[in-house]
């Protein structure tokens, strides 16, 4: 896991954005092999255009849990964005309330280590957080209102994620295949990957069938 993050760093369409409405924070050392970053608003923001409206989401081989917190209406929503194969524009609304966004970005191969469910066949979709992370949602959501800053939310979330981390769900064949593809800069043939991982082409297809 540690070697992979040194070989591969997924980025967004605007990787250098860093302001009050969008900021990426690197996780603690223990979570760094599993979490690409935390991101969101640095603090609650009021009455402004949705900054994401001028942006675009590109396939980044990551999955995101996103919480939108509305301090004016005293409510929140949470959803999971799975792996996307296509780009699409986001936003386009005017935010009149005081709101905040907080999100956890997983590598595609690590989200399952914090979930109670299976992600097979769930690509290009968005789901309610509780469908895949019911225990994490139950513990985290009640705390979101009480901690206004992004840094504060990260502190409590890291503690919960470390408790939820289940490394026994790691698929070694998957990790070996990913390592080989990254090591060869994506030029490896399927037959080469099968030889490296000692699995059949059919089994390899099942492993990558999201």
Language model features: what each stretch is:
Residues 1-175, 181-191, 196-201:
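Alpha-helical bundle regulatory/interaction domains
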Residues 207-210:
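HTH DNA-binding helix-turn interface
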């Amino acid at each position: 896991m540690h070697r992979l993050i040194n070989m591969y760093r997924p980025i967004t369409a605007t990787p250098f954005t860093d302001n009050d409405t969008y900021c990426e924070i690197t996780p603690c050392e223990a979570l760094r092999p599993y979490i690409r970053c935390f991101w969101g608003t640095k603090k609650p923001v009021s009455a402004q255009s949705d900054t994401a409206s001028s942006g675009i989401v590109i396939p980044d081989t990551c999955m995101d849990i996103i919480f939108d917190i509305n301090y004016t209406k005293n409510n929140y929503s949470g959803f999971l964005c799975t792996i996307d194969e296509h780009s699409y524009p986001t936003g386009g609304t005017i935010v009149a309330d005081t709101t905040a966004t907080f999100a956890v970005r997983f590598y595609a191969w690590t989200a399952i280590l914090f979930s109670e469910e299976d992600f097979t066949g769930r690509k290009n979709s968005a789901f309610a957080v509780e469908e895949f992370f019911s225990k994490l949602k139950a513990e985290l959501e009640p705390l979101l209102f009480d901690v206004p800053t992004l840094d504060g939310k990260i502190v409590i979330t890291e503690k919960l994620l470390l408790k939820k981390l289940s490394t026994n769900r790691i698929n070694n064949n998957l990790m070996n295949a990913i390592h080989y593809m990254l090591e060869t800069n994506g030029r490896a043939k399927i037959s080469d990957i099968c030889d490296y991982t000692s699995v059949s082409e059919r089994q390899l297809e099942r492993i990558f069938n999201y």
